[in-house]
Amino acid sequence: MAASGRGLCKAVAASPFPAWRRDNTEARGGLKPEYDAVVIGAGHNGLVAAAYLQRLGVNTAVFERRHVIGGAAVTEEIIPGFKFSRASYLLSLLRPQIYTDLELKKHGLRLHLRNPYSFTPMLEEGAGSKVPRCLLLGTDMAENQKQIAQFSQKDAQVFPKYEEFMHRLALAIDPLLDAAPVDMAAFQHGSLLQRMRSLSTLKPLLKAGRILGAQLPRYYEVLTAPITKVLDQWFESEPLKATLATDAVIGAMTSPHTPGSGYVLLHHVMGGLEGMQGAWGYVQGGMGALSDAIASSATTHGASIFTEKTVAKVQVNSEGCVQGVVLEDGTEVRSKMVLSNTSPQITFLKLTPQEWLPEEFLERISQLDTRSPVTKINVAVDRLPSFLAAPNAPRGQPLPHHQCSIHLNCEDTLLLHQAFEDAMDGLPSHRPVIELCIPSSLDPTLAPPGCHVVSLFTQYMPYTLAGGKAWDEQERDAYADRVFDCIEVYAPGFKDSVVGRDILTPPDLERIFGLPGGNIFHCAMSLDQLYFARPVPLHSGYRCPLQGLYLCGSGAHPGGGVMGAAGRNAAHVAFRDLKSM
């Protein structure tokens, strides 16, 4: 990583962080020997769980390994003066009731909605004085159709119907996100009370079926087929298909030709912000500001959050019930229940005494698919990139496309598939798929005047290189240079604008953020690891084989993304169990 000041851009001193970032919160009253509930990990789901439990009167403590809260939803000043959303970088999926219930606006959350939201520049020679074409999509359907018509009149006419079709599927899936999956084990073998409770979990499924109606078989195909098959049924132009397909493969070690890739696309279109379906935006101050707002909501009601307090072990009594945790320094903290925001692998294979868990359960956890294609590169630049397809304004101020997700090497679905095949051979993609975002285009607080922060979400990248070779600094820099070379073709001068960079390969994402294999979802969002089967079959309702232990992170239903649903749902399940103790 290099840092230097150039042009209009001046690096400034690091700014202070909130209290729970500078040190742990013992100064707020100290660590107590006992709480009603302990949450392992201060990722956004863990913070959401703590906030709900505390509001329900459950005295809750959160223990975070790192010096900063938020997990992957964090803001870090890696280069002085530049504040990066170091891992997660966009917001849309956070459940609307969490905004309301936790009063996040009251606790400082501010959003910048993006419109337009998608920009795909072409690599083609302009005819005469014409610049290369680009595809710019936003909330104005008429303008979207005009943009798409550059490539296909037919696709322009069909696009509103496609959007309506996907919107209906998102509406059907929506109720499933806010409740535990159907508890088939309780339904088949539980007590009468357990069976009655499990019947209530069928309601979201029945509601989804009613919404989809006679179109259910067609929607089933969307969830199970390769996204290329789905998109080919709608469209003919590659720039549009490839742009849409990026949402089906982002964060997933899959090709657009992989069966089931359609669900990941749906996962990225079913969100919304401030009542706008499908809207995505930037959090003012970076993603860490969201985590700060949730933490503020939790602590205002009495929750305790401790940083640099690593949980080493879940404590179990002689009757096989959870009774608290042991910290890395040997401190014992008793509790009636433990909610783990860490991955299923860390929770069950590292923190929980193995003798208390069924062998088959442990085997299934160890077999979870955690492959990740992602390398995240955070870049400080001294000016905005100027794309051949959309040159910068004379004074260098942000233009509409700068606020978008900018898709590079994405003009054709074949490019996406070829990038995937490289990784399957143990090689970094020759032409990586790049999603480039510039949050400082809407939030100038993230960088010094005249400067910007650039988020590069790139794939595909194997965890281990061909021949079993591990990542080292030379390989890491070589890959980042390749990514920069690709950007340079679309936006000449980009490389010269770079002030510094932070390169996070899959092993780095695993080491720093605890993401298994670097997987941003904790484990793959494939159909065999969703709903009934997340993290494993018969244990998808946040409860674990060990009484009093709950999974509340992205490895639980409904999965990854900055959604908060797993934390909220797990908190409600745990609270119901606590009342019945």
From Swiss-Prot:
Main location, first listed in the record: mitochondrion
Locations listed in the record: Mitochondrion matrix
Entry GO terms, CC: mitochondrial matrix; mitochondrion
GO molecular function: oxidoreductase activity
GO terms for biological process, alphabetical: mitochondrion organization
Keywords, alphabetical: FAD, Flavoprotein, Mitochondrion, Oxidoreductase
Enzyme Commission no: 1.-.-.-
Key word Lipoprotein present: no
Enzyme class: oxidoreductase
Pfam families in alphabetical order: Amino_oxidase, NAD_binding_8
Subunit structure: Interacts with COX5B; this interaction may contribute to localize PYROXD2 to the inner face of the inner mitochondrial membrane.
Function: Probable oxidoreductase that may play a role as regulator of mitochondrial function.
Name assigned to this protein: Pyridine nucleotide-disulfide oxidoreductase domain-containing protein 2
Organism: Homo sapiens
Taxonomic path: Eukaryota, Metazoa, Chordata, Craniata, Vertebrata
